[in-house]
Amino acid sequence: SEWFKSVNRVKQQLPDSVTTVELFKYAAPLVTKLGDGHTMLRFPFNDYFTSSTIRLPLFLNVKSDYTLRVRGCIDNLIPQDAEVLSINGKESRELIESMMDYASGERDFFRIERINSDFSALFEMMYAADKYDVVYRMKDSKKKLEVTLHPTTWAELLPRMPKKKEQARVPDYSFKVDEKKKVAVMDFRSFNNPQRMKMFADSMFVTLREKGIKNLIIDLRNNGGGNSMVGDVLFRYISPKPFKQMGKALVRVTPTTIRLTGRTQMVPGWSFYNDESKGNFIPPLTKEEGHYEGSVYLLISHHTFSSAGSFAWAFKEFGMGTVIGEESGGMNVSFGDIIYYKLPVSGLS
């Protein structure tokens, strides 16, 4: 296949000895070619960024329209939210497109989300220089401005960055009620801890019933996934019918899978599971048990991924309410759970 041809080409290009960053540069594009957001090679941040590493003193947000917006700059030389047009002659679109080889995902807009997280590291790996000539323009302006930035260490950079307000840690899930508008908004950030979700959901829906709140907005726009069982807990309160997030699965177990997971009871081979029979569906709660009888709206974005993506498609499939927003980051036919492991020599994970 074309993928194995790519593997062979990389093998031929590899020198006898490489650093972890160099190995990442060779190997990550091969992993990206698989086209799956759950299958990725992580950048070796700790190996690359040390106390003596000098870096571009500019932090950027990567947007889905292939533009770059300033998040922060040394001495505030480029104001926040200004648009960076080019760095050392490389236009923003060219920079982003060149990094796509290192961003795993099914859809380009989700891969850009990945680049947004790793932009500083990928930029240093690919475009490190002695100085950086930056062309930018202010928000809502067409006038091009220029500034030259010089790389600095983190210790020098940090005290010279614009001060930000300290932000409190955002909980995995929270809610607030607007009693005048009779609406509640659940801020759902992570699919974590099914037992805690049960306690949270009980409390939230009791509050909504007591206050007569008939409209619930579930905000899933900043949710990258987690444990799908958390979604099942919440679904029991809002689904009008029995539901299931996953219908069928094709499972392959290899000796490598067994070694990496430590699940020695697994048997190598292929298995097919069909859970679409009605007996395997999860029943919603009854009204007496606390089922929510109001209208539910689900907000999603390109960042809605993994367990959050499966939550979104099950929400729509079983008629739980109205979905509003952008296409989610994952696909409803996808790889299943993930296995974390480190390569034995390089330590890349």
Language model features by range: what are they?
Residues 1-216, 220-250, 332, 336-343:
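Flexible, low-complexity junctional segments that flank or bridge functional domains
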Residues 82, 228-349:
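Conserved acidic, small-residue-rich alpha-beta core segments centered on
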